[in-house]
């Protein structure tokens, strides 16, 4: 039996026999890279639970180390080092880690490498590591049995962390194990805040007796190496030392031992040399008093670097550990740290442990978020068989295969995309349109079907479009032909399948008579049906006004009928600028809501006069009635009918038992509105908006998206209502139309307000405000303690900059939510309210992102009642509410008050730069 088989059997037995004890390892990600599929086990040396790596990466091959270096010849070989994942293809291959604590938190990331001649070449490779888009370190091995360990402390800039291996032409990259550990985000501070990562240089246990300090002794699972020169003594204690006083939490076996010089008057000295004098080093020194000092004894210490003081004099505590670090980076070639006793000290200096890190700047930029979302959608839609992991454009030396980028701005942009011969199937996806800065697109030699979509003409910077070698049919859109004719676009298509207007006309001569004849027959039949239905309508409503015919299931009511079904307008269930809403009941008992339109209905446009209000009401009533007849979606309020008999106007909807979202959030009912329910409401509303933008032909922009226009039924399912201000766009063009500004203060898109240009992103802005109201429980416009008006975006800004998601979330949730889900939700909301509409996501992306938020919430464990109370108590102690819920009905907007401008929040919270 081969060595690998023996090891695998033993490996499986241990994996089955040991109960995986993940408790205490909350937030740990421990990956055995290259392990067999579906293998999960507990490492007997560390007690750490490891898992296979396929869920984290879809590239590379799994291989075992050679028999010479594996089990049983090496019986003490740690399980994670017995196999590797190797990456013979692609310049950059990335593991995708999604830590449970999400963005804004500090993590220790550790990668392990043992070559073990896994490829039989006896050739030690050299390659680089990156975290996200920034360089981490180079991996160099001295021999095949060496276990090279690399560590970095890094703040997560998003919910996803990419750890990438980069081939630099010196051998095939590989990896044995990858680990992530959540840290206390307040420790390991530097003068650069969170704008650097810290790469481990050394971590020494200077009073080492035995052990490594790893988990479970070290809650952060740091690996401590022994360091004890012959000129040092070692002291220890068995007494209690509080390691939790400080967030650094050194393990007992490390802090309870210390080094001291053999001569009491000598210092403790450490030195190292840097090959790069510009490297910035930070040292973290650990101290605790281990001796019972007498009354006439004292230990007072000062720390020096290259002769300059790092700290003032201090006395190590016998009760708890303390950590001292340099506030300014150490730079230069030669470094010398000296721990000395002061003149007043009777006892020699001590040092329990030390960590030294080099600071790695986060200099690289990320790809523009809209481009990332678009290319990820393309990747998912077509299941692109390329090594597309990590950021598409960054680091700039290693973009994705087939992608060309522009690196002239603070965010990189995709300029060219070559997917020729990539096995693409199906129609040309709408996601290509969202690569708005694209100059060259090559989709040739695939199996794309359907028409050439007109939205490709929206790519205004496109200079080259190659669609040859596909199964596309139909006309070339006029807008594309026009650009190609004007020599602004190099267009390549298959002439035999895709036709210009003249050639298609000749080819369709036979079809024209058939189509015309069919249409004539259909028209005659339709006229006959209409005549019959009109006659029946006159009988049913004898004496009533005969207006447009309503579709099946919709009714036109007379005023007397409206009065009857509302019991003479007996019960008011809502009021607003449009008029009053009454509860009604149809003959079959179905409850309905009757919205009576008054003469001051609907929002006035910017610059409108009162003299035009009556005609405006009539126009908006007509717009809403016509739209309600044509739109049908489960997340749009269902339309029953209307009344317009010359005296009164009314719109009649299905009754929504829980009223509108604005009132519900302000009521006592909101106490029971869990985070999961809020996410469902957000998704429902987003889907309704998505239907208006992308499911209707022609598209519709609502123009008055707000919590008051989102209705809730008895199951808290959300439906968008009130289409009086809606705008129908010509054909499928959602670029923009110039129109008077209408909407509600606090929700109006500032870009629309200032330019009069309306498009779908105006609705997206308003929806971003709705999302912020959902998560905060605040109104779109509120009052501060000093009586000033504040928009909800400005309310959340300071919390995001501090990375305080608890400060953002509605306290009525009592802390019972997934922080990962909440951060993602706020990220979506803030992306919706970016200054420029082009930088906001479309509703397709919003729906997708919100579903991810829901998935994260459903995956978590709910908090206990005790935990909820503690969260609320802590939150109210930290931040008393300085903003009160404020009714937007009290707010009368001037032109300036809705002309709001907010910063770009593609990155925010603790990682805002």
Swiss-Prot record:
It is a single-pass type I membrane protein. The active site is at residue 704. InterPro entries: Kinase-like_dom_sf, Leu-rich_rpt, LRR_dom_sf, Malectin-like_Carb-bd_dom, Prot_kinase_dom, Protein_kinase_ATP_BS, Ser-Thr/Tyr_kinase_cat_dom, Ser/Thr_kinase_AS. Keywords: ATP-binding, Glycoprotein, Kinase, Leucine-rich repeat, Membrane, Nucleotide-binding, Phosphoprotein, Receptor, Repeat, Serine/threonine-protein kinase, Signal, Transferase, Transmembrane, Transmembrane helix. The modification Phosphothreonine is found at residues 558, 739, 744. Residues 879-896 have a biased composition (Low complexity). GO terms for cellular component: membrane. Glycans are attached at residues 64, 143, 184, 195, 210, 233, 296, 408, 418, 434, 471. Residues 567-877 form the Protein kinase domain. It comes from the Eukaryota. Its EC number is 2.7.11.1. The chain crosses the membrane at residues 510-530. This is Probable LRR receptor-like serine/threonine-protein kinase At4g29180. It comes from Arabidopsis thaliana.
